[in-house]
Amino acid sequence: MYNPFDEAYHGLCEEILEIGNRRDDRTHTGTISKFGHQLRFDLTKGFPLLTTKKVSFKLVATELLWFIKGDTNIQYLLKYNNNIWNEWAFENYVQSDDYHGPDMTDFGHRSQQDPEFNEQYKEEMKKFKERILNDDAFAKKYGNLGNVYGKQWRDWEDKNGNHYDQLKSVIQQIKTNPNSRRHIVSAWNPTEIDSMALPPCHTMFQFYVQEGKLNCQLYQRSADIFLGVPFNIASYALLTHLVAKECGLEVGEFIHTFGDAHIYSNHMDAIHTQLSRDSYLPPQLKINTDKSIFDINYEDLELINYESHPAIKAPIAV
């Protein structure tokens, strides 16, 4: 079946595999990479959740709502069984003086290569998650990821200590001055990079109103094509829907612009498996509430007619 969203994503994967540069990287995993690429998704044609592997809409939506709420603590995510950010918080904990368990140095690589260590790692992670959920003081200290996306979107702080809600301001601008070229939200705050568990990969987005439709363009400096990008596509498509509804507009395009678009060397088999699959028709999104974007919960969102191939597991590079 024809699915323009799968087709665009598959095309990017194939191009990276064909012409990409082999590079070392921060995680020492190794990548094949292309610098500079753009995908365009017409959101009137459906919701761009890939169908050639199962992508969890719940994980996409709860992470985005976490950003929108300005939250930076994984406790909110874990309440929805969303484990996307666990490794970065866990890393901070096991490097602290409060951790007294087995040595977790380089747990990302060791858990993939040593089955015995992997069992220890899973047990320590399980205990960590339980403490985050059940011990608010512990969660406050070790569940916080620093000044990551939610903080920058909702509470940007300048050098004078003034605070600025970028997302709320942009929504107000769209309502009052839709033709402005300043509908921009940035997560890249150079003065706070060192205080973030992970510097923002999706760094800046801009809205553009045209004929009653809201378009959104994202610039992503670093893009994990197999694990991250399917989530990023769906996340910013959902953001476009939510902001459009808030502003009384229809959705238009989501434009995804990449800097370093890369496939990790240990994702090659997974990518080839996905590329061998045929697509299903794209699903539809329904927002079952008139709440403000800042009050919406996951339960207010509904994904209709999502049919996909099974998920494909691959290791995360920390």
Swiss-Prot record:
The protein's annotated pathway: Pyrimidine metabolism; dTTP biosynthesis
Active site feature: 201 (nucleophile)
Record field: catalytic activity: dUMP + (6R)-5,10-methylene-5,6,7,8-tetrahydrofolate = 7,8-dihydrofolate + dTMP
EC number annotated for this UniProt entry: 2.1.1.45
Entry GO MF terms: thymidylate synthase activity
PROSITE patterns tied to this protein: THYMIDYLATE_SYNTHASE
Binding positions (dUMP): 26, 181-182, 221-224, 232, 262-264
Superkingdom of this protein's organism: Bacteria
One Gene Ontology cellular component annotation held by this UniProt entry: cytosol
Keyword Repeat tagged: no
Localization annotation: Cytoplasm
Gene: thyA
Subunit annotation: Homodimer.
Any GO BP annotation: methylation
Primary location class: cytoplasm
Top-level EC class: transferase
Record HAMAP family: Thymidy_synth_bact (MF_00008)
Pfam families on file: Thymidylat_synt
Keywords: Cytoplasm, Methyltransferase, Nucleotide biosynthesis, Plasmid, Transferase
Protein name, UniProt field: Thymidylate synthase
Record function comment: Catalyzes the reductive methylation of 2'-deoxyuridine-5'-monophosphate (dUMP) to 2'-deoxythymidine-5'-monophosphate (dTMP) while utilizing 5,10-methylenetetrahydrofolate (mTHF) as the methyl donor and reductant in the reaction, yielding dihydrofolate (DHF) as a by-product. This enzymatic reaction provides an intracellular de novo source of dTMP, an essential precursor for DNA biosynthesis.
Family assignment from sequence similarity: Belongs to the thymidylate synthase family. Bacterial-type ThyA subfamily.
Coiled-coil stretches noted in the UniProt entry, renumbered to this chain: none
Gene source species: Staphylococcus aureus
Binding site for (6R)-5,10-methylene-5,6,7,8-tetrahydrofolate: 224, 317
Keyword Amino-acid biosynthesis: no
